[in-house]
């Protein structure tokens, strides 16, 4: 089962998940928010103990810089 999680205001939930041992599986997916067409979001596929989890956060310059620091590719979906 895939666990879906949304924290669209900031990336604190993503940082918490990483602290809890979740690992990002690149690429990170960039897309338009289905609920608010004018907003871009990033989806991260996380894994821990053989279980996937999808986290969605707002696309910000700070998040992009952090992704660049990790050297993760970004795939644009729509």
Model-predicted segments: where are they?
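Terminus-proximal functional modules
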Residues: 1-78
């Amino acid at each position: 089962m895939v666990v879906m999680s949304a924290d669209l205001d900031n990336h604190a939930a993503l940082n918490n998940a990483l602290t809890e041992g979740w690992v990002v599986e690149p690429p990170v997916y960039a897309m338009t928010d289905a609920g608010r067409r004018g907003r871009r979001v990033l989806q991260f596929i996380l894994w821990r103990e053989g279980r996937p989890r999808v986290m969605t956060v707002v696309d910000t310059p700070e998040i992009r810089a952090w992704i660049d620091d990790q050297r993760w590719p970004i795939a644009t979906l729509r």
